Amino acid sequence: MKNKIIWILSIFCVVLLGLWLWSQRPGLRVEAVLPSQPLVYVRLDHVEEHINQVIHSEFGKNVAAINFPDVLNRNNFSLKDTKDFQHWQRDLGRIWQNPLIRRLLNKEAAVAIYRQGDSYQVFVVVRLTLSTRIAELLSQLSHQWSGGAISRRQKYHGRVVNHISFSRPGLGLGYVRIRDLLILAPESLGHLDEIVDVYQHRSVPLSADSSYNFVRQNGYPFSDGLLFVNFNLISDFWRGEMDSRLTSLGYQTAAFPVYGLSYMPGVVSKFKLIVGLDQKYMTSGIRKTFACPALANDTLKLVPVNAILYSWGGCYDFAQAWSTAKQRLAERPELAESIETFKHRLERHFHMNMRTDVLPILGHEIGGYLTDIDMEGSYPFPRLLVFMKIQDRAKAESLLDKFTEHPVTTLYREQYNHVDIHYITLPLGAHTDPGYGFLGDYLLVASSRQLLKQSIDAYNDSFHSIVSDDAVEQFSLDKGGKFHYVTLLKTAELSRRAQDFLGWIDKYLSGRISMAAVSKQDGDNKKQELDEVIADKSAELVLAQKKLHQLKISSLSLLPLEDPETVNGAIQNLSRETDALRDDIAKYKEDKEDISRLMDNYASGAQSDKLTMYNMDNVLSPVLKGLESINAQAVTVRFGDKVLETEFLVK
C-alpha cells in the first residue's frame, strides 16, 4: 500500500513538473504564424494593463468627463452623427467591460491587415494563458451575441479550423489555435488556411519579411508594442493622390516606403517612430538634407532653468532655403516683385546685401526657448528667445553695427556680465524691450532683455541652466549624444500657461459678446428711429403726390386763366420734392438694411464666440487639465541614409 501511494505521488509530481516545464517554454512568436507583406500590423503586450493605465490616469479621467454628445450637438453635427457616436461609445464600454474580452486581452494581442487586390484580409491574434479554455470562451462569446450560434469544424493539414456563424448580427467568425496563440478572422475577411500554411512552413511568415524586420530591428529590442505600415502596398489611387500633393515639395511616397512605431513603457515611456528612406526618389536638395551629420547639442547651456519649451535643430541650410524660396516665388511673379522691392529697400537702407553679407555668416544650428506668456499687457506677450550659430562672429558684429548706424527706432545698450546687450523699448507693458547679444558663437535675439540676462547667467553657471533640471538628465539630453533635432516640453507648466492663455481669450471673447449686445441695442434704436423717419417721409410723399395730382388736374381747367409758366413751375417744384422724398426714403431703407447686415454680422460673430468659449471650457480645458499629470516630454530626431528615427519620451 505504501509503495502504491509513493507511485501515485511520483506520477503526480512528474505531471506537475511537465505542466510547469510546458508553461515555461517560450511562447510561439506572433510573427511565426502570420503571412508576410501586411499592409498594417500592430502588436501590443499587456493590453488590458496599458488600457487601464490610460483610463485611470488623470488625462484619461478628464477626457472621459467631456460630454461628447453635447459637444457634437453644439458644434452643429447632425442628430444621426450624435446618436451614432453615443451608440459607438456605449458599445465600446460594453465590450471593454466584457470578462471575455478582458481575458483575451490579458497578455498579448495583434492585428494584421493584408491587401488582396481591391479587398482586404484581417487576422486578430491573442496569446492565451495556460488556464484559458477555448470552448468556454466561445460559449461566452455565443451567449454575448444572444442570437444563437452554429459551429462547424474543418480539418486542414492536420489542424482544426473552427467556423462560427452568429445568426442575429449575420456575422461569421473563424478561429484556429496554434500552441498558445488563438488566431481569429471574420469569415468574409480572412482565410485561416493561410495561417496553417505559414505555421507549417508552406508560406513565408511575417518574421521573414525584410520590410517588417527593418522596422523591428530599428525599434526597441524588448518593446511592449510595435506598429508597422508598408506604404508600398497602399492602393495606387491613394498613392497617386498623395504624390500629387508631395511632388511640389520634392517628395514622393516611394521615398518613405515603410513606417513603424515602437513602444517601451517605464518611468520614462518611450515611443520611437521609424521611417524607411529610399533616396533615389528624392530631389538632390532633400538628399542633401538627409546627408547632414548629427551633432552634439551644445545649446542647453544657453537655456535658463525656468524655460518651459525648448527646441534646437542642427541641420538648417539657409543658403539652400534662400534658393528654394526664390524658385517658389518665381512661380508667383506679382508676389516675387513686391518681396524683391522690399528686400532692395532694406539692403539700401542698411547698406548690405542679403546673399553676400548675411547668408555666409549663418551657421546650421538654430533654436530657442519660451519661459512664459505675459498676460498683464493689452495682449499676450511671449517671453521668447531665439539663438543661431554664427560662422564668423566678427563679421556678424560688423553687420549688426550697420543696423545700429541706421536704426528704425531708438536703440539702447547695456553691459551685463561683460556681455553687450542691445535693445529697444515697446509701449506694450513691462519688460517689452526686445534685444540681441552674443554668447560664444551664438547670436541671441529675445523678446525681452531680461531673457538675454537669464541666458548669460545660465551660460556662466550650470546651476541656472536647464541642464540642472531632472527631466534633461532622465531624457539623457546632456550625455553627449548626437542628434539632428531636439525638443523639450515641460508639459505640466506649459499646460498651465495654456490654460491662462485660454482665460485671456475667454475675457477677450466675453468683451466682444458684450460689445455685440450693446451694438444690437444701438442698432435696434437706430432702426426704430429710421422706421419713424421713413414713416414721416412716406406720409409727406403721399401728401406731395396728392398735391401734384390735384395740381395737374386743376391746371387743365385753369390753364386759360393762369400763367402757364407759373403752373408748370409749381408742378416741376412739386415733382422735384416727391423725387427727393423718394430718394430720402430709399436712402433710409438702405441705411436700415446696412444696420441689419451689421447687426447680423455682430450676432453671427457673437454666436461663433460663444461656441468658441464653450469648446474651450468643455473640450480644451479638460484636455489641458489632464496634461498637467505629464511632467515633461522630449522629442529627438536622428536620420541617416536608410532610416529616419523620431523618439518621443514621456515622463
Give the location of each predicted region.
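Generic beta-strand structural signal
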Residues: 115-117, 155, 175-178, 415, ...
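A short alpha->loop->secondary-structure connector
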Residues: 141-147, 191-210, 460-465
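A short, solvent-exposed beta-edge/loop patch
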Residues: 162-198, 424-460
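Leucine-rich, highly hydrophobic segment in Treponema pallidum outer-membrane-associated proteins
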Residues: 10-36, 40, 167-169, 174-179, ...
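Active/binding-pocket-proximal capping segment
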Residues: 389-417, 459-465
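Flexible, glycine/threonine-enriched loop-and-boundary segments that flank and lead into catalytic domains
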Residues: 361-362, 369-372, 415-431
